[in-house]
Amino acid sequence: MDPVTSDLLSIVVPLYNEQDNVILLTKKIHEALPGYQYEIIYVDDFSTDETRKRIDQMQDQYVQLIHLKKNYGQSLALAAGIDVAQGRYIITMDGDLQNDPTDIPMMLEQAVNHGFDLVTGIRQKRQDSWVKTIPSKIANFLVRRVTKLDIKDNGCALKVFDRDIAKDLNLYGEMHRFITLLAFLEGAQIKQVPVKHHARHAGTSKYGLERVFKVIADMMLLLFIRKYFQRPIHLFGIFGVLLMILGGIANIYLLGVKLSGEQIGDRPLLTLAMMLILAGIQLFTIGIVMELLIRTYYESQQKRPYRIKKISKGGQVQ
C-alpha cells in the first residue's frame, strides 16, 4: 500500500525499563511504515535497566533517544518527545508492544484524508489482566459520565495527532489519561477507530488498582479548572478523595442505624465521619491551590517541568 502522506511523521514512545521490548518494537515500526518518512523518538524516563544502552547499540539513524534527568512519569516523557518532534503528524504509542504499529497507516489515512486533528484507538479484545481492565473500565465510565464526552478508551496510547494540536497540549504530571479530552477542549476534531491489542511482550505493567483513585482526583481537577488543566493533584487529591469516601461510608452506616430507631448523636463515629469529610475537602482544596501555583510558576518562568540530560541519534550524542 502506498503511503497516504509524504510529510514527516514523528513517532513518540515513552520508555521506562523496556530493555526486552525496544529492539523488537523498532523492528516492527520499520516493517509497518515502508515508504514513509519518519523519525522514532524514544524518551527514556530514567530507566534503571539497559533500555538506553540497547537503543544506542542499534545505531539506527531513524531513532532519536531523549535521556531525561530523572523519572518524571509518562505524561512529561510524552511532553518531552512531542516538544522535540519535527513531524507534520505526531504518533504516540506505548513501548511494551501492546500497541500494534501496523494500525498506524489506517489511522494516518483518517487524519490525512478526512481532516481529523486526533485519531485515537479503541483497543479490541484487550490482552490484559483484570488488574488493568477493571480500573480502565471504571475510569472510562467515570469520564463519560462526568464529561458527557463519549470517549470509549481513554487509556489507549496509540494516537495520531495533527502537529498543531499535539504541540498545544500542555502535559503536566500524569494528564496523559485525559489527553483525548484535553485535545477536545482545544477544539480538535476527533475520530475513534478500533485497533489491535497484544499481550505485553516482556517486563511488568506499571499500573494497578490505585489508578482508579488517581482518575477520580484528575477528573475533579479538570472539572474545577477546565482550560487550565495542568498537573493532577495526586499527593493531596488521592488522600482527599479517600477521606471523603471513608466519611461517606461512615455516614451511610450511621443513617442506617438512625433509621432503625437508635440514637446516633452521642456516637464518636458521627464526629469522626464529619471530620473525615471536612479533612478530605480541605486536602483537595489545598491540592487545587498548589496546582494553580505550579502552573503560574512554570508559565511565568517559561520553564518546562522536565529536564533533558542529552539527546542522541543513531547512538551518537547530538
Model-identified regions with their sequence ranges:
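Short beta-strand/loop segment that forms part of the nucleotide-sugar
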Residues: 26, 30, 37-47, 66-68
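Acceptor/aglycone-binding surface of glycosyltransferases and processive sugar-polymer synthases
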Residues: 64, 68-84, 89, 101-182, ...
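A conserved acidic beta->alpha catalytic loop
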Residues: 44-53, 97
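Cell-envelope/extracellular polymer assembly enzymes that use nucleotide-activated donors
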Residues: 8-10, 39
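Donor nucleotide-sugar binding loop of glycosyltransferases
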Residues: 18-21, 47, 100
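Hydrophobic helical membrane-anchoring modules
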Residues: 2-5, 178-318
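Short, well-formed alpha-helical segments that are part of the catalytic scaffolds
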Residues: 18-32
